[in-house]
Design a protein with these regions (language model features):
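GIY-YIG nuclease catalytic motif and its immediate N-terminal context
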Residues: 1-38, 43, 50-53, 57-67, ...
Length: 88
């Protein structure tokens, strides 16, 4: 079974959403139509990144990582190519 991890970014909000699905096209259409269950509503979005896995467990582990602090840093550095702002 193919499982897809995806990262989308709200165009107006600038917020990222990380999710997994077994049908990427259907899931993105659910986000577009506002029918995505369990996810935040981000409006119009841009698909930033996808990864394909052969099993749910591995995809879920990757999703959990990308939702962590280190994972968000990886997204910023690798996908968005930015550095987090440093407060002082």
């Amino acid at each position: 079974m193919k499982v897809f991890l995806y990262i989308i970014r709200g165009i107006s909000s600038g917020k990222n959403y990380v999710g997994i699905t077994n049908n990427l096209e259907r899931r993105l259409n659910e986000h577009r139509s506002g029918q995505a269950k369990g996810g935040q509503v981000i409006g119009d979005f841009q698909l930033l990144h996808t990864e394909e896995f052969t099993d749910y467990e591995t995809a879920r582990e990757r999703e959990i990582f990308l939702k962590s602090g280190q994972g968000r840093q990886w997204i910023n550095k690798t996908i968005l190519k930015t550095r987090p702002a440093r407060g002082g």
